């Protein structure tokens, strides 16, 4: 401490310097005062203790005594090297610890008391002592960035690969770059590789797995509980031992066992932040709504927001699955109970399902048309000449057109109305019955001559004047897939009954108009008839919607008018 004269002299000098310099000088002087005061208090304490010792030797008994571990830790916490040396000389173990497993060496490595650290190590303190969370003194020194203590601990044989309860080694916890360089240099000098590091990390879990296999071989109960009510699955869940937990779950270990505090394995995994373990337990039926004795759910025990979000997502998925299962059961029972009712249960596919269904149909349809168009072009060129030759021979031989196989007109009309005479199906539509030959689905050719114009004979004078529905279609460009979709959708929506008079209008043509209409019918992609027999007339513009044209029904023909036989 400076004398009074020195302080006055310094004060006169400080009046001439800037304010910043005076502030620095004041801070320096204050630090010296505090240091002197601390030294004074420590000296005073020592004098008191000496005086007490002298009095105790006089025959007076102690009234308060402390355990050696408490006294040693208290002296280390105060950085009292002399008292620590006194305890060590009196045969007090340097490895004594408190209820948390913390030794004097741990405490000195945290507070950076280098002198006491050397003193404890020189008296045989365990350099790799572990507390309740498996932290060694090297973990503490590396975490705090005390490079001088790290060097001392390594010189005394500290384990560089020691793993704590979180699975971290000293170099995992070190954030100070110079200290980390020292640790990594020592690891490289000892020949530590990444394979060895991984092996050391997995060693605790591997030991637990081997113990579980021994219990299985001995036929012991895997739901065994310890003194706190914890099972092996609790331990695996708290430490994040996934392989050990999977082994236990595969052998039927219960996931809902509670310890004395009401904790299930999922609570332990949530409290210690074991996210993969929580997912594994939930997938095996662990309840996210289970509560402890303190009415806490697993999500209430989480400290990390990321883990809370994960548990909320798992809970939401679990609720959705349960609701879907209940809905499925209720729908099955409802269908069973209302089997006789009509239209009470309406099932609609979702918009996405319908869109995917239409897309698949259109893709398949496009592929089908690419294959079929090439085959039909080749087929058309092959038998197109046969058609003309057949028609010419028939016109020369028989002025009255007829079917190659005699069929009554009434039966023919009946078959058409019932849909028994169908042409090849193209684009999901039925090909019309025409007066020419067609290629059937099995590859055969169905031949048919022109039919006489019965429409005039049975009182439909306006039918013959109707222009052919495909008269303007021949000159159009090939239809696109979009047009095919629109035509097909329109044809499916129409649900009108088949009009038999369309047959007469389609077959009552002259030889010239018939030859012009053959090409669109044989080589065209779509038919003017829908799958339910409805005739659809298309305008010249391909983009216009199809129009339905109705005609008066043909009167029922009598069988006596046309016989099945004729005189040639």
UniProtKB/Swiss-Prot annotation:
Residues 566-568 form a propeptide. A lipid is attached at residue 564 (S-palmitoyl cysteine). PROSITE patterns: ANK_REP_REGION, ANK_REPEAT. It is a lipid-anchor. It comes from the Eukaryota. The modification Cysteine methyl ester is found at residue 565. Induction: Inhibited by TGF-beta1. Down-regulated by LPS. One of its GO terms (cellular component) is nucleus. ANK repeats lie at residues 100-129, 133-162, 228-257, 261-290, 531-560. Keywords: ANK repeat, Cell membrane, Cell projection, Coiled coil, Lipoprotein, Membrane, Methylation, Nucleus, Palmitate, Phosphoprotein, Prenylation, Repeat. Residues 373-403, 505-527 are annotated as: Disordered. GO terms for biological process: establishment of endothelial barrier; positive regulation of blood vessel endothelial cell proliferation involved in sprouting angiogenesis; regulation of filopodium assembly; regulation of phosphatidylinositol 3-kinase/protein kinase B signal transduction. Phosphorylated by PKA and, after PKA priming, by GSK3B. Phosphorylation by GSK3B reduces its association with PP1C and enhances PP1C activity. Dephosphorylation by its associated PP1C results in enhanced association with PP1C, but reduced PP1C activity. Residues 505-517 have a biased composition (Low complexity). The keyword Oxidoreductase does not apply. A lipid is attached at residue 565 (S-farnesyl cysteine). The modification Phosphoserine is found at residues 69, 333, 337, 350, 477. InterPro entries: Ankyrin_rpt, Ankyrin_rpt-contain_sf, Pase-1_reg_su_16AB, PP1_Regulatory_Subunit. It is found in: Cell membrane; Nucleus; Cell projection. GO terms for molecular function: protein phosphatase regulator activity. Residues 386-403 have a biased composition (Basic and acidic residues). Residues 15-55 form a coiled coil. PANTHER family: PROTEIN PHOSPHATASE 1 REGULATORY INHIBITOR SUBUNIT 16B, PROTEIN PHOSPHATASE 1 REGULATORY SUBUNIT 12. Interacts with PPP1CA, PPP1CB and MSN. Interacts (via its fourth ankyrin repeat) with the mature dimeric form of RPSA/LAMR1. Interacts with EEF1A1. Interacts with PTEN. Interacts with ECE1. Regulator of protein phosphatase 1 (PP1) that acts as a positive regulator of pulmonary endothelial cell (EC) barrier function. Protects the endothelial barrier from lipopolysaccharide (LPS)-induced vascular leakage. Involved in the regulation of the PI3K/AKT signaling pathway. Involved in the regulation of angiogenesis and endothelial cell proliferation through the control of ECE1 dephosphorylation, trafficking and activity. Involved in the regulation of endothelial cell filopodia extension. May be a downstream target for TGF-beta1 signaling cascade in endothelial cells. This is Protein phosphatase 1 regulatory inhibitor subunit 16B. The lineage of its organism: Eukaryota, Metazoa, Chordata, Craniata, Vertebrata.
């Amino acid at each position: 401490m400076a004398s009074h004269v020195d302080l006055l002299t310094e004060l006169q000098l400080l009046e001439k310097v800037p304010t910043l310099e005076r502030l620095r000088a004041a801070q320096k002087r204050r630090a010296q005062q505090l240091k002197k005061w601390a030294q004074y208090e420590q000296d005073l304490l020592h004098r008191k203790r000496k005086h007490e010792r002298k009095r105790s030797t006089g025959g007076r008994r102690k009234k308060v005594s402390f355990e050696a571990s408490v006294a040693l830790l208290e002296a280390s916490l105060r950085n009292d090297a002399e008292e620590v040396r006194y305890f060590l000389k009196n045969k007090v173990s340097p490895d004594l610890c408190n209820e948390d497993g913390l030794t004097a060496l741990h405490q000195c490595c945290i507070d950076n008391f280098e002198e006491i650290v050397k003193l404890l190590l020189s008296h045989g303190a365990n350099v790799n002592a572990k507390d309740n969370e498996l932290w060694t003194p090297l973990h503490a020194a590396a975490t705090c960035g005390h490079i001088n203590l790290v060097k001392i601990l390594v010189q005394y044989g500290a384990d560089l690969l020691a793993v704590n309860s979180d699975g971290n080694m000293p170099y995992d916890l070190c954030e100070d770059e110079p200290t980390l360089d020292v640790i990594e240099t020592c690891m490289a000098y000892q020949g530590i590789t990444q394979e060895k590091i991984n092996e050391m990390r997995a060693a605790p879990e591997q030991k637990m797995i081997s113990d579980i296999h021994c219990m299985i071989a001995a036929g012991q109960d895997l739901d065994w509980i310890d003194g706190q009510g914890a099972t092996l699955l609790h331990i695996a869940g708290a430490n994040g031992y996934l392989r050990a937990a999977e082994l236990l779950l595969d052998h039927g270990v219960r996931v809902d066992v509670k310890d004395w505090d009401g904790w299930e394995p999922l609570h332990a995994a949530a409290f210690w932040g074991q996210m993969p373990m929580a997912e594994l337990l939930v997938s095996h039926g662990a309840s996210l709504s289970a509560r402890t004795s303190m009415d806490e759910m697993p999500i209430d025990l989480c400290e990390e927001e990321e883990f809370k979000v994960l548990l909320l997502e798992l809970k939401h998925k679990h609720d959705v699955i349960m609701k879907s299962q209940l809905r499925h059961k209720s729908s099955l029972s409802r269908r069973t109970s209302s089997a006789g009712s009509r239209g009470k249960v309406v099932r609609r596919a979702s918009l996405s399902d319908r869109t995917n269904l239409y897309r698949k149909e259109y893709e398949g349809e496009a592929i089908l048309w690419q294959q079929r168009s090439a085959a039909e072009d080749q087929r058309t060129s092959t038998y197109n000449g046969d058609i003309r030759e057949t028609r010419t021979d028939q016109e020369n031989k028989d002025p009255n057109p007829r079917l190659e196989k005699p069929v009554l007109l009434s039966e023919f009309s009946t078959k058409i109305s019932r849909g028994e005479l169908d042409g090849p199906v193209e684009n999901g539509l039925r090909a019309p019955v025409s007066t020419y030959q067609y290629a059937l689905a099995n590859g055969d050719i169905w031949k048919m001559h022109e039919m006489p114009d019965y429409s005039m004979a049975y009182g439909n004078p306006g039918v013959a004047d109707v222009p052919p529905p495909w008269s303007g279609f021949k000159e159009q460009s090939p239809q696109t897939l979009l047009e095919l979709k629109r035509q097909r959708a329109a044809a499916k929506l129409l649900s009108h009954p088949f009009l038999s008079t369309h047959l007469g209008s389609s077959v009552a043509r002259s030889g010239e108009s018939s030859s012009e209409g053959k090409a669109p019918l044989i080589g065209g992609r779509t038919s003017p008839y829908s799958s339910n027999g409805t005739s659809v007339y298309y305008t010249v513009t391909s983009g216009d919607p199809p129009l339905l044209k109705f005609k008066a029904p043909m009167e029922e023909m009598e069988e006596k008018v046309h016989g099945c036989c004729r005189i040639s």
